[in-house]
Amino acid sequence: MAENVQNPPVEPLAVIGMSCRFAPDLDTPGRLWEFLRAGGSAVGEMPDRRWDPYVTDSRTRDILRTTTRKGSFMRDIEGFDAEFFQITPREAEYIDPQQRIMLELAWEALCDAGLPPTSLAGTDASVYVAANSNDYGRRLLEDLDRTGAWAVNGTTFYGIANRISYFLDAHGPSMAVDTACAGSLTALHVAGQALHRGETSVAIVGGINIMASPALVVALDAASATSPDGRSKSFDKAADGYGRGEGGGVVVLKRLSDAVRDGDPVHGLVLASGVFQDGRSDGMMAPNGSAQQRMLEEIYRRSGIDPGTVQYVEAHGTGTQLGDAAEAQAIGNVFGPGRDGDNPLLIGTLKPNVGHVEAASGIAGVIKVLLGMRHGELPPSPHEEPDPGLGLEARGLRLVAEPTPWPRGEHGMRAGVSSYGVGGSIAHAVLQQAPPRPDRTERPAAAATGRPQVFPLSAASEQGVRGLAGSVAAWLRAHPETALDDLAHTFTARRSHLSRRAAVVAGTTEELLGGLDALAGGEKSPAVALASASGFGDGGAAGPAWVFSGHGAQWSGMGRELLTTEPVFAQVIDELAPVFSEELGWTPREAIEAGGPWTVVRTQAMTFAMQVALAEVWSDLGLRPGAIIGHSVGEIAAAAVAGSLDRAEAARFACRRARALGKIAGRGAMAMVPMAFADVEQRVAGRDAVVAAIAASPLSTVVSGDTAAVEALLADLEADGIQARRVNTDVAFHSPHVQEILDEVRQAAAALRAGTPRVTLYSTALADPRSDAPREGEYWATNLADPVRFHQAVRAALDDGTRVFLEVSSHPVVAHSITETALDAGVPDAHVAITLRREQPEQRTVLANLARLHSLGTPVTWSYDGDLVDVPAVRWQHKPYWIFPDTAPEQGAGLGHDPQTHTLIGARTTVASAPVQRVWQTELHMENRPYAQSHKVVGVETVPASVVLNSFITAATNEGERACGLRDIVFRIPLAAHPTRVVQVVLEQDKVRIASRIKRDQESGGVRDDEWLTHTTATVVHEPEVGARPMEDPDVIRARCPVSWTWAKVDGIFRTMGVDGYTFPWVVEELLRGEDEQFSTITVDHTPKLHPSSWTAVVDAALTASGVLVMDENSNVLRTCSHLESLSFVGPPPPRIHVHTVRDPRTPDTISMTVADESGAVVCEARGLRYVKVQDIGSGAVGPRDLVHELAWEPVEVPADAPVPSQALVVGGAAGGPALVEALTARGVRARAVPDATAIGDASLTCADVVVVAPEALLPGEAPEQAARRCAQLLVDAVQQVAAVPDERRRPRVWALTREVRAGATEAALAHAPLWGAGRIVAGERPDLWGGVIDVAENAVPQQVASLIGALPHTEDVLSLDSEGVTAARLRQVARPAEREPVDCRPDGTYLVTGGLGALGLEAARHLVEQGARRLVLIGRRGLPSRSRWDQVDDPAVAAQIAEVVALEAAGATVRVLSLDISDAEATARALDPGALDMPPVRGIVHCAGVVSDALVEKTGAANLDTTMGPKADGAMVLHRLFPAGTLDFFTMFSSCGQLARLTGQVSYASANSFLDALAALRRSRGETGTTSFAWAQWIGRGMGETTGRATILEAESRGLGGITVSEALRSWAYADRFALPYAAVMRVMPDHTLPVFSHLSVTDAGAQSADAGGVDWATVPAGELPELVLKVTHEQVAAELNLAVDDIAIDQPLLELGVDSVLTVALRVRLHRCFAVDLPPTILWSNPTVRALAEFLAAEVGGATADAEETDPVAGLPAPQQGSGTAEQLDAVAAAAG
C-alpha cells in the first residue's frame, strides 16, 4: 500500500533510551522481554504488609475481607536510594514511592540513551509523567497529626515530574499528566508536540502506577471493573474484568535528526500520536468503539500513514467483554480492510503478563513494541481461548498466541499502541523500527593489542560503586565478546561521573574482570583507584596543580616505553632534537635510549625534555592544569607548559643553563635535613661553606655547599640525634657555588620573551609565590642563585583552594614534601598523584594516576572512541522508606507479644525519626517467656539467642520485607527475663535491634531515653544465602569425628558450669567430635507448645549443640556469644536435623554450622559464631585501678650527723666533675676525678669511702642511644672494679649521679637514664657495695651534691635533688578522674607493632584491632615466609605466628609483616617510607621489641648491653626520629617494672627499659600526650613470662612484685589510656613488701576485705532502712569507680550505656565486693543493669546474709558463706546466647 503523500509526516521522533520496572521484579527491558517471550504472569497475592494498617479497624476489616487481593504486585515499592538523589531519609519517607521509582527510572533511561544525566543541567530538557492514583500521598495528607512540610511536594502528581527536573536541573517543560489509563500515551503525545515546536530538545516521558492502599481497589470492585483472580484475560472468552498491576516505564525522546547528529542509539521511531475523547456515551466509564475508530482514522489520516502498513497493534485490551468487543471492532474497521487469513493484523497486549498498570500502561506497550522490533519478534499475548464473539478472524485480526516473527513490510516493522482511559480519554501512537545504524568505522581494538585503558565507574556511595562493579563484571562475563573500546567509550563519555568514583586500568577483558572483582569485593589492587570526588559531577571541580620537580628524578630506562606507546610523547621528544643537538651535541631520544650516564648536564637538560613531553601526555589524555608550580630547574618546563615561554626557546635556555652547571660539577654536595628552613638557617649561621638552599616543606630543608662543609654539618646533626641524608648530586645548587656561572645564565636567559601564562603560575624563586614577574632575564638568575621556596608555593596553592597535585616528573621527588606541607597547613584531604616511578611500567603508571585523579574529582576530557553498549550504569542501594498510619492493635498475650510465636514482637507503633523507626513494644516477665522451658545461666533466667533472632526475622517479615536471614549480629549483653522488663524491637531501614529497660513500680514520672539498654543488633538480609545444595555425606563427616559424647555428658558439663535447662524440647541423638569439627543429629519435638512454622526451636538446638565444639571436658571458662556473621535459612523447619559444625582454624573460639534435613538438603547456615570470655574477678583478680601506678616523689630527711666519707673517687669525666671534686674537698673529703673505672682498684679505698659514677651525658657527635650504652657500661665497670677488690673491708660504696633524668626534657637525660635501671639491679644483687642514684636538677649546686654523697640512706632506689631539697621515688595508684577520652584507633590509619610476631606483640596487635585498627604493620627481625608458602610451613612456632596473623585478618584487619631490624635507621626509614609502605599514614606505634641477655653485674659486658639496648633503645630512637612528637596519636612503649623489685641478672635489660621511660618523658616534654612507657610486671604465660624461671618469679613476689594476667594487662592498658601518663607501672603488689618504692602501696588484693562504705556495719542496719542505704552507697561506689559525680548518673540508666565496658565491669564488681562482702557473678549486669537494680540485688544479698548470720552464728556481723553464686571459672556459657 502507498502512503498518503498529501499529508507527509512530520519529522519522526527517536526513542533513544528506555527503562522499566514491572511486577514482580522486572527491572530492566531485557528481563521484561524474556518474561514476555516466555508468556509469564506476574499475578500473585497482595503483600500482607500493604494493607495491614487498614485491617485493625473492625469497620474496614469487614470491607477488605471481600476485596480483590490478587494482582501484579512489585516485590519492592519501599526501597529507594535516597542518598543517590541527595534526599534525607526523613524526607524520603514523605515522598510517594511513585516519585521515587520515577527518579530512578529516569536516570536509568538517560543512561540507556548514553546521555549523561548531569549533562542536562541548565538545558531545555523536559519531563512528562503520567499518574492517576496517589494512594500513599493521600494517606499521608489525611494523617493530620504526622503530616509535615515534605508532604507538600512529596504527595502530589506534579511532584513526580518536577522532582526529576529539579534533580537534573532541567529547565524545559515539566508536568504531570492524568488522563487515567491513557496517561502515558498522552504524555508521549504532549512531549512530541513540544519537540516538534522546538520547546525542548530532549524529553523524558513515562508513567507510573503503585497500589499503596486498598481504597481504589474497593471502588473498582464496586464498579465490577476488576477480575476476582487479579488476572487480565484480554480478548479471552473468560474475560471478567482487569487485573491491576504495578510498575512504571520511561522513554527518552529526541528529534531523529538530533539523535543521528549526536550519535545516540535509536530503539525505534514515533511517527505519529494523538489524544481524543469519547465524549458523551453510555456512561463515563463505558468504552466507545465509535470514538476509538474515529481517533485511529484521524491519526493515520493526519500523519499520512497507511494503516495497511502496520503489522501489529498493542491493544488496550482491559479484559472486560464490553471493552474488548468495542476495541476489536474499532481496530478491525480501521486496520482490517484488505487483510485476510494470510495477512492478518496481529494484535496483543501485555496486560495478561504484568497486569493493567493504568497510567503506565501506554508506555509499557511502547516499550514492549520497541523490544519486539529489536528482536524482530512478537511475544505471545497469554490467553486460554480467544472470545469467538469478537469475530477477530472475520475482521482480519489475529491474537498473537506464541512467539511470532515480526512480518516485514515496505517500511520495515510498524506498530500501533493504544491506551484508553476510564474517564473517556483515548490515545494512540504509531511506532516504526529504527533506521539502520551507520557502518561502524573499523579501528584497532585495544583488546587485540593489550593497550591499557581507564574504565571509570561512579555512584553516590562506596557501596554503590562496589555494587556497580559487581554488576558490570557479571554483565561482562555474559557478554565476553564486548570490545573494550566500546566499554571505555561508554564509561567515559556516556555516563555521568558522580561523587564516589572508582576506575580500573586494564588492557584485556581478563584484566578488567580482575579489577572489577577486586573493587566489588573490597580488595586492594594496583589497577583500581577508589576515592571521593570533590563534588557531584565534574562541573565545579578544578584541575590539579601540576608540579614540575627539580633535579633527581632521572633513571636509566626512563621514557623508553613511552616512546613506543605514546605518540605525543615521542613527538615532543623529537621536536626538541634540533635544539639539543645544536646546543649539547645529542638528542633527547638518544639520551633516553642510552639510559645515561647521568651527568649534571644531561640530567638538567633531560629533566626539561621529560617534563614537557610528559605534560603533553597528560594533555593528550584530557587533563588540564588548574595551576602550575616549578621547582628549581622544573620552573623552566613549568613556564613552557603554562604558555609563558615558547617551548623551543625554553629548551634552548635549559640546555645552556645545564651546560653552565656542568662547569661547577664535582665540587659540591646537598643534603636533606628534617628541620624547618628557619631552624636550618640558624644552624648553619656562621658556616661560610654551607647554606639553606631549598625550603622543601615545613619539616624538611635541603642544604647546599662544599662537600666537606655539608659532611661536617651532617655529623653535627647526627650527634644531636637528627638524621639527615645526602642528596645524590655533586653540584651545590642554590649556593654560592653558582655565582661564577650566573652571568652565563643571565646571557642565556636574555633571549627569552615571556608571555602571559594561560594558567596560574606560582613562583618558587621569589618571596611572593603569587608574583606575576615575567619569566625572563634576571628571574632565571634568581631561580638558580636564591633558595627554592617550594614550601611557600605549595602553601599558597593550598590557601588558594588547590587540593590535588600532580607531580610531572620521571620519578616522584617532591610528592612527600607536598604531603608534609598540606598536613602542616591543616589540609588532610590534599592528594598528590605522580606521573612515573622508577622501574615501573610507564604507560600503566600514567594511567593508574589518571584513574586516581579522575576518582578524586579531577575533570578529564575523555577521548576514547567506540560505540555505546548497554552495560549496567547504576546499582541502586535501596533502603526501605515507608510511613504507616499509627495503629493500636489488640494486645496479644503478654501485653503485646504472644509467647506461642517465640518472639518478643508486641504492639506496633511508628516513631517519627529520621529515618523512621518501626517499634514493637511488650513486657517480659517470668510468666510470659516466649520459650517453652526455663533457661537459667548462673541463676539468671536468660532469653535464648534463638528467640531474639526469631523476633528480628518476624519484625522484618511483618514490614513486608523478604527476610531470608540476618548478618552482622552483635550480642552486646543477654536479655534477662527477671525482673520485669519493657522490651522494644526496633526496625530502622534494614537495621534491627532489641532493647529493654527495667519496669519501675511507679512510671508516672515518664521514662528517660537513657534508661534503655540495647542487647542485640543485626542487619536484615533480603536475598537468600542458603543455596539449593546438599550437605557433605554424613558418613564421611562421621568418619572424621571418631569421638562420641553422650548428651548426658554434655549436660553434666553444662550444669556444672551453671547452665540449667534448655529452652525447647529437642533431643540429641548423636554427637560425634573430631579435631576441629563435630557432627550431631537432633530431633525437635514439635509439641503443641511449639509454633509449627517457627525456626526458633531448630536454631536453638543447632546452636546449643554446635557450641559444644568450643569446650572440652574440663571447660571452666565462661564464654558467651559475641558476634554472628550471618544466619540464613530456607523453607519450613524440619523435625529432624543433621548439624555439621566446624571450628575456624584461625580463630578457635569461632565456629560455623550447616544444618540439613533428613534428605541431606541444607536448610540453615550460621557463619562466624564467635565466643568471648566473660571477664571474671575470680579469687585473685583485681580491677585496673589497683594495678596501674605512677611515679611520685616525697621528701627525704637528710641526717644532720651523717658521717663524711674519707675519700671519694669521681669516675667518668663529667663536665661537672671538677666542681664536685672541689666541693667534696671543701667538706674535708680527699677527692679526685678519674676518666674511667680502671683506677678504682689502685685507689686504696675503704668501705668508708665512695665511688661516684658521673659520666658526661653526651660527647660531641654522640647519639643519645650510644651515650646510654657508654654511661651504663661505666657504672657496670665501676661496680665490677669494686666487687673485684679482694678485701671486702676495702670495698667502697658506689653512687651514681645523673642529671635532669626526672625532668626528662633533654636528650642528655636519655644518656643518663639507664643508670636508674642498672642501679636498681645492682642494689638487689650487691646491696653491700651500693649507695644509690642521685638525680641532679639543673638548679642544684655542687655543694648540695657533695653534702649528700655518703650521707643519704643507701636503701633508696633513686633520689632527686633540686633547689627545694631531696625527694625519693614512690609508686602510687592512679586514682583520680579520667583526664581524657581513651585513644581509639582510626580505621583510616596505620599502626606499627615492633616485636610484632612475639607473644606480647601479637597480644598488642589484637588489642589494637579491638580498639578499631584496620591496618597493622607487624615488624619482626625474622618476619614470615611469603604467603604462598604458609601452607607448607612445618615449624610449629612459625605456624603459630601465621595463624595469629590470619586471625587478625579474619577480625577485619589488613596486616603487613615486615622482616626488619628496627634498630637499623636506614632500613627502617626505607621500609616505612609512605611510598614503599603504600598504606595510610602511621597514626600509632606500639614498641614491643625486646631481647633479654641476663647476667649478674659482675659478668655483664658490652655484648649484653648491645643485645638489649639495640631493639629497645636504638629501635625506639629510630621511631622517635621518624615520627617526631606531634605526628602520632599514640606511641606506646613496653618497658618492665622488674627493676623496681631489683631482680637479679637484669642490669642490661633494666638499662634499656629505663631508656624507654626517659624517652616517653622527653616526648611528653615536647607536647605529645600520647606517649607512654608501660613498665609491665610479668604477663603470666606470655612473652618473657613464658620462659621466666620459677626462682625469678619467687624473687619478684618476695620483693612485692606480682605478675598479671593477659586480660588484666589489657584492661590496665585501656584504663591508663584515660590519663596523661608518661610512665605507668602495671603490677600486682604482694604481701610483705619492704622496698621503699612500694612503701605507699597496699597489697593489691587486701582491699577485698574492706572498702569505704562510709563505715557501715551492714549487720547492724535495720531491715527497713537497708534498701535506701544500700542504694545510696551503691550509687556512690558506682560514681567513684566511673570518676563521675553522683548526680551525673541516673539510677535507672543502664551502666553499659554509660561506657561500662569489660574493663570497668570487672573493676566495679571488685569495688562492690569489697564494700558489701557479696560475690557478684560475671552475669550481674545481665539481670541488674542499673544502679537501682544493682542496689536491689545487693540489699537482698546483704539482708539475706545478715538474717542467716543472726540465725546461725552468735558472732554479730560475720556474713554467712555465699552458696551457689558461681564464678566464671565454673562456667562455659556456650548456651548463654546460643541456647
From Swiss-Prot:
Annotated stretches, region: N-terminal hotdog fold: 902-1027
Annotated EC: 2.3.1.236
Pathway: Antibiotic biosynthesis
PKS/mFAS DH domain mapped to chain residues: 902-1180
Pfam families, alphabetized: Acyl_transf_1, KAsynt_C_assoc, ketoacyl-synt, Ketoacyl-synt_C, KR, PKS_DH_N, PP-binding
Positions of region (C-terminal hotdog fold): 1042-1180
GO molecular function: fatty acid synthase activity; phosphopantetheine binding
One Gene Ontology CC term in the entry: plasma membrane
This protein's record includes keyword Phosphoprotein: yes
Biological processes, Gene Ontology terms: antibiotic biosynthetic process; DIM/DIP cell wall layer assembly; fatty acid biosynthetic process; secondary metabolite biosynthetic process
Alphabetic keyword roster: Antibiotic biosynthesis, NADP, Phosphopantetheine, Phosphoprotein, Transferase
Positions where O-(pantetheine 4'-phosphoryl)serine occurs in the chain: S1702
Domain of life according to the entry: Bacteria
PROSITE patterns: CARRIER, KS3_2, PHOSPHOPANTETHEINE, PKS_MFAS_DH
Gene3D superfamilies from the UniProt entry: 3.40.47.10, ACP-like, Malonyl-CoA ACP transacylase, ACP-binding, Malonyl-Coenzyme A Acyl Carrier Protein, domain 2, NAD(P)-binding Rossmann-like Domain, Polyketide synthase dehydratase
Segments forming domain Carrier: 1664-1742
Protein function: Polyketide synthase that catalyzes the biosynthesis of the bicyclic aromatic compound 5-methyl-1-naphthoate in the biosynthesis of the antitumor antibiotic azinomycin B.
The protein's name in its UniProt record: 5-methyl-1-naphthoate synthase
Annotated gene: aziB
